[in-house]
Regions:
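Short "lid" loop at the C-terminus of a central beta-strand within the Rossmann-like core
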Residues: 54, 103-108, 124
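Conserved beta-strand signature within the Rossmann-like core of class I S-adenosyl-L-methionine
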Residues: 95-104
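A short, conserved alpha-helix within the catalytic core of class I
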Residues: 78-88, 102
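Short glycine/proline- and charge-enriched loop/turn segments
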Residues: 111-119
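Short conserved AdoMet
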Residues: 20, 79, 93-94
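A short SAM/SAH-binding and catalytic strip from SAM-dependent methyltransferases
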Residues: 68-81
């Protein structure tokens, strides 16, 4: 689906600029059809996939192994995002990138009218300030791309 590919490119294209070919990348929460993983493989990346429901192979959850980890439209579904964030950082090598895609809360007023919160599978929400706090807590640099992508860099 070309539209979904363009959607995923909002995360993939800026991440790809940071990665040499043949880097180890984990697509965490890839869902039943790992389109992003396929896109990354097509660009020469060494990609593993993990999804709690569709690709539950725990052997890919390796410490200090990945050059990049992607989590697209996932973190808002997690009941314990703090644990997931810590796991991602454990699996990420030094100088690795964690790319997260989720709509961000912009204000309390906007939240009240926000369609995104009405999806009952969305159980937690993040603002730019929250992501900045996470980056500072874990001594990460960060970059926001558009209104739904954050890339954290582990140094």
């Amino acid at each position: 689906d070309e539209g979904y590919k363009q959607f995923l490119n909002r995360l993939w294209l800026p991440l790809k600029e940071r990665l040499p070919v043949n880097q180890k990348v984990l697509d965490f929460g890839c869902g039943p059809g790992p389109l992003l993983a396929n896109m990354m493989q097509d660009e020469g990346m060494d990609v593993s996939v993990f999804d709690h429901f569709y690709h539950p192979d725990q052997s890919v959850l390796r410490a200090n192994y990945y050059d990049a980890i992607t989590a697209t439209e996932l973190i808002e579904h997690l009941h314990q995002p703090k644990q997931a964030f810590k796991l991602w950082l454990t699996m990420l090598k030094l100088n690795g990138d964690l790319a997260v895609m989720t709509k961000r809360v912009t204000s309390r007023e906007a939240f009240a009218k926000w369609h995104y919160k009405n999806d009952l599978t969305h159980v937690c929400f993040f603002s730019e300030a929250c992501f900045i706090w996470l980056a500072q807590m874990h001594q990460l640099s960060y970059e926001f791309i558009g209104n739904d992508v954050a890339i954290f860099h582990k140094t």
